[in-house]
Amino acid sequence: MGTQPARKLRNRVFPHPHNHRKEKPMANDQVPASKCPVMHGANTTGQNGNLNWWPNALNLDILHQHDRKTNPMDDGFNYAEAFQQLDLAAVKQDLHHLMTDSQSWWPADWGHYGGLMIRMAWHAAGTYRIADGRGGAATGNQRFAPLNSWPDNVNLDKARRLLWPIKKKYGNKLSWGDLIILAGTMAYESMGLKVYGFAGGREDIWHPEKDIYWGAEKEWLASSDHRYGSEDRESLENPLAAVQMGLIYVNPEGVDGHPDPLCTAQDVRTTFARMAMNDEETVALTAGGHTVGKCHGNSKAELIGPEPEGADVVEQGLGWHNQNGKGVGRETMSSGIEGAWTTHPTQWDNGYFYMLFNHEWELKKSPAGAWQWEPVNIKEEDKPVDVEDPNIRHNPIMTDADMAMIKDPIYRQISERFYREPDYFAEVFAKAWFKLTHRDLGPKSRYLGPDVPQEDLIWQDPIPPVDYTLSEGEIKELEQQILASGLTVSELVCTAWDSARTFRSSDYRGGANGARIRLEPQKNWPGNEPTRLAKVLAVLENIQANFAKPVSLADLIVLGGGAAIAKAALDGGIEVNVPFLPGRGDATQAMTDAESFTPLEPIHDGYRNWLKQDYAVSPEELLLERTQLMGLTAPEMTVLIGGMRVLGTNHGGTKHGVFTDRVGVLSNDFFVNLTDMAYQWRPAGNNLYEIGDRQTGEVKWTATKVDLVFGSNSILRSYAEVYAQDDNREKFVRDFVAAWTKVMNADRFDLPRG
């Protein structure tokens, strides 16, 4: 939980973001508000769009984000190459200088911006959740709604404005995503912590993400019972990792604003686990985050203006204008809680645990009316000084989440060790901070810069380096051995697909590299059909063992899928080359944190026409979810579905959607028959349909909703019609191979990106 935590804001403090702009008098030549100029025909506010008219329509927008039309950078711009030209040492020096270069428009507490910068970085990284890999700091998304206007992010707009001169100076070589995390890390370094390291590589996006589900609430900080299915505080709705809308983790005043440290401890444990933190890391991050900086609540709610997205144009993207006195310094308003945690809030020390363990604590209200814990008795010299006048001292504070660190038995035991062993605490925190700020950056192969730690950490999903090469002749020889092994096209394609489909473009985890499909837990996932998988792996392992030179099983799995596809295309009369680039390694079980891979388990896969069970979300929506996480477009999704069906890759060998009499041949039959008006569809059970001859009624095929959506949705049908055309049979094969290759290489960060 970050310093100066703004996660406890109530609606009484910061209202729901409406349009706060007041009506301005019109000039004589202005059109009255009740009229709309003819030239304003664009739907510029998002009102009355198609989804307003048909709210249940399938929304394909999540597949069409972050394209060239929204990106101001030149074609061919490569951020990784640009970052490698950055003078990182100079940036770090500038950040160290910034920490104590207080600006009159937003003065630094005690003359040091460290606490503010840490909170900014924390709240950027802290949105990450392991369930779907979304959120986090790797895209610089804190610049955009809703995050730039969350109640928990009050006044972080000022932190980013303070960084603007540095961003402006280093330009394209330094993304906002990298700068935000580096600023937080340098803040700790400037206050005395020996940091673990820093890696660049966060490439900025240029508009808000459309795919991230932040919750169903329509009100900031709505009661947390919206997110829990029962009284059990472990039942937080998946994939969410915050207890209320607009918070990063927990409400530090207590559950729904009601102080109870033991109840809050349950929320802390659940939310931190949702981002893959264990109990020791949780205590370290909580304590380390609150060793420096302060909370701000020395104002009244009615004096605070709207958030950035609701503020007037003259605010220029800033929000929460404070009309209380100067509105800054000791009168700053952020979370509603008021005070610092430690005696020396601008230096790294063990003061947090000293405060917790050496005082009794009682509940009080801040000037803004927020619950906070204050010491019953405290020596004057142990109190932190005022942010403006060092001759004035104030009581330190603790949030309900801080009290959980000594009230929860497990947390208390960890806290006691950290108190006894400050060096150990600093070491654990430094590594936990690195994990927090790099968890969504992907494997170590994506890390950039001279400060990357040498140590391999298990949460980075390490893969051994590859020390072999394969010639074209050797690749051909391996293909021939695989095709002559007795394995079918379906078996080879299914195994390669299952190995690669775990890739998530959100946090760059999963994929075929590493061949973790042969390890726990993946080898026993029902979606991977363990019996079929074991059969295929045994054959490929035999080929691997008897080949004349080293080759990874990861490469053989992908090569086998590609060889099978080339054969299936040739059986249909089309010769095609399925690109294959060796270089994948084989991870070991010791390199694999089995528990951390559980969220990657496919419990649905429309590409293989499979659901582990019935879900409240429709099958076609689940298909979009998987497609978006895999980084695929709607046309790529369409061509892959059509190809996978005719190749006979359905889970369990079902025939739903297999609209062909030539199973195993890569053809466009799926689209030809789907769009043929000689057939008529009718329901035949739960998520099942029959296609029959329109004249005789004879049943020809069966299908699921995932199959039929490519004929019913107007956008998807337009793609299906392209691939059904007589002149696009070869195009279908080419496009299928291109999309397939993209999936197989999604986690090959060693390859050039084009």
UniProtKB/Swiss-Prot annotation:
Binds 1 heme b (iron(II)-protoporphyrin IX) group per dimer. Its EC number is 1.11.1.21. It is an enzyme of class 1 (oxidoreductase). Optimum pH is 4.25 for the peroxidase reaction and 6.5 for the catalase reaction. One of its GO terms (molecular function) is metal ion binding. Its cofactor is heme b. The record marks 119 as: Transition state stabilizer. Homodimer. PANTHER family: CATALASE-PEROXIDASE, HYDROPEROXIDASE I, BIFUNCTIONAL CATALASE-PEROXIDASE. This is Catalase-peroxidase.
